From Swiss-Prot:
Key enzyme in isoprenoid biosynthesis which catalyzes the formation of farnesyl diphosphate (FPP), a sterol precursor. It is found in: Cytoplasm. Belongs to the FPP/GGPP synthase family. The keyword DNA damage does not apply. Keywords: Cholesterol biosynthesis, Cholesterol metabolism, Cytoplasm, Isoprene biosynthesis, Lipid biosynthesis, Lipid metabolism, Magnesium, Metal-binding, Steroid biosynthesis, Steroid metabolism, Sterol biosynthesis, Sterol metabolism, Transferase. It is an enzyme of class 2 (transferase). Mg(2+) 2 binds at residues 114, 118. This is Probable farnesyl diphosphate synthase DDB_G0268742. Its EC number is 2.5.1.10, 2.5.1.1. Mg(2+) 1 binds at residues 114, 118. Its main location: cytoplasm. GO terms for biological process: cholesterol biosynthetic process; farnesyl diphosphate biosynthetic process; geranyl diphosphate biosynthetic process. It comes from the Eukaryota.
Amino acid sequence: MGSHYKIDLENEREEFIKVYSILKNDVFDELPKMKLASNAIDYIKELLNSPTITGGKMYRGLGFLYSLNTLLIAKNNFDNNNNNNNNKNSETSQHEARIIGWCLEFLSFFLITDDIMDNGLTRRGELCWYRHPSPFNPTEHKVGMLAINDSVLIESFLFFILKKYFKNKSYYVDLFELFHESIFYTATGQLLDSSSFHLKRGDFTNFTFENYSQICINKSSHHVFYLQIKIAILLTDIMDNNEKQKDDTTCKEEKDKEKEQEEELIKNICFNLGIYGQAQDDYFDCFGDPKVIGKTGTDIQENKCSWLICKANTICNNDQLNQLKKNYGNDNENDVSIVKSIFKEINIPKHYENFENEQYNSILKEIQKLSIISLPKSEILLFLLKKLFKRSK
């Protein structure tokens, strides 16, 4: 990147959005070469202009830019303090970094199929894409199950953009593989998350925090938190500005051990951030205002292994648990109302508040451990943690 400065996320958001117009045009310019019918091209244009991609908080893309800039500032400071004229990182420009940020945002293609599996109504304040009027025939048809193919299209656009801008970069294969790995983990997480819908109603043996953690780690932790940091590290080859310069006699085994310890800490922190963030989403699904969170909750109807039901499974008395087993996972308003009333009866909101504070403090301690090894990387994770803490949507 040409210049390194503390990023202003509000200003950066404006610049970031401008880059999306360029990437859309890259895709649009490619479509005529495929000799597609004009209505198919119009369909894809409407898809790429939908809130599915651009209507969110852009947490992944902007978070990545913050991570990358933080590491680059630290590397520059280290190089300047040690008269090191290493220009290796100039290989990636600010514009290219924003493109990678948008590739991270393209991972929202998972939301399309997630909404179908969850029978969702709204997403990001709009109708879910599969419920959206069909661009082919908006007066008579919804997008419907064609949305499954649309999610594959968006995934393909991600790799089209990666190839267009980064195929000649030394890190292209690594970047490509990181995205594929993250998609693999997320798809596995989606499988785990949706599997409870197929379980027998009233069977709560699956509703444990052990199972819940595995869902969160695979479904959320990898692509929301871990991937952006891994890519930022890949692009910087950082030498932390808080560590003393090591001489040539430092043994390779010691360096490898330190790197392994750092990697393990980062991974565990990201995993716990994913659990924390998913628990927040679960709480909003039940108790949030759809106008604020931008979607209508369906976890109770879909028999989801959510934080709320896992907690209830551990604290309910027999009568309350029997009522939950009778009503949880049913798609009618009366049963949903009974479940919510029991959640309130056992004071789930208070238990959630305690969990949020405990999770914040626990992750903060892990970040403090990381700061001893790598101050810049700990700053990134602290930034992500503060973005989550007490969020309202």
